[in-house]
């Protein structure tokens, strides 16, 4: 699913009808402004989904210099949190800092981390299993609250939160099985 698909869906839900948002020449000034606002909302909502519900996990071969790995050297430097650092088959301890991670060795390793997308545009492909209609509800809620449309924002946010909770419950993530004990 592309960002443009989400924004097209938002245009329909906001009452503008079916509009090709990728054709910038045929958009009015108001529609162009709305596309820019909705693009920012897509970034905010998708970042929340990645950070809180469904992480976008990346794995990368890296080189630690002086026992440090600078985030700026990664393919995607917008890191949310580190998951693991492996040297061969062995998982090594890491300590996260704002601009780098530190470990107890220097050299080659495999780094696994949760990251945000580097940038958002109409042609950006969104990873994950969140359907377009659900992401659109979150974007509309974000847009509505920013423009003081409280009722519309509350309705869209309710649908978004319920949909995310249902999707997370069915994805197998977050399930907790109570430990059983022998009597």
Predicted segment positions?
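Glycine-enriched, solvent-exposed interface loops adjoining structured elements
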Residues: 1-183
């Amino acid at each position: 699913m592309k960002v443009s698909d989400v924004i097209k869906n938002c245009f329909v839900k906001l009452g503008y009808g079916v509009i090709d948002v990728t054709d910038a020449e045929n958009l009015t000034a108001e529609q162009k402004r709305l596309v820019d606002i909705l693009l920012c909302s897509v970034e905010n909502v998708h970042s929340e989904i990645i950070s809180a519900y469904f992480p976008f996990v990346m794995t990368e071969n890296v080189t630690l210099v002086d026992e440090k790995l600078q985030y700026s050297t990664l393919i995607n430097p917008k890191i949310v949190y580190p998951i693991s650092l492996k040297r061969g088959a062995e998982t090594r301890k890491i300590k996260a800092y704002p601009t780098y991670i530190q470990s107890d060795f220097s050299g080659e390793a495999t780094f696994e981390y949760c990251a945000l997308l580097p940038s958002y545009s109409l042609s950006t492909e969104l990873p994950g299993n969140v359907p377009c209609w659900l992401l659109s509800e979150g974007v509309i809620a974000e847009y509505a609250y920013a423009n003081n449309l409280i009722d519309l924002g509350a309705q869209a946010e309710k649908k978004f939160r319920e949909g995310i909770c249902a999707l997370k419950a069915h994805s197998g993530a977050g399930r907790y099985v109570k430990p059983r004990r022998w009597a």
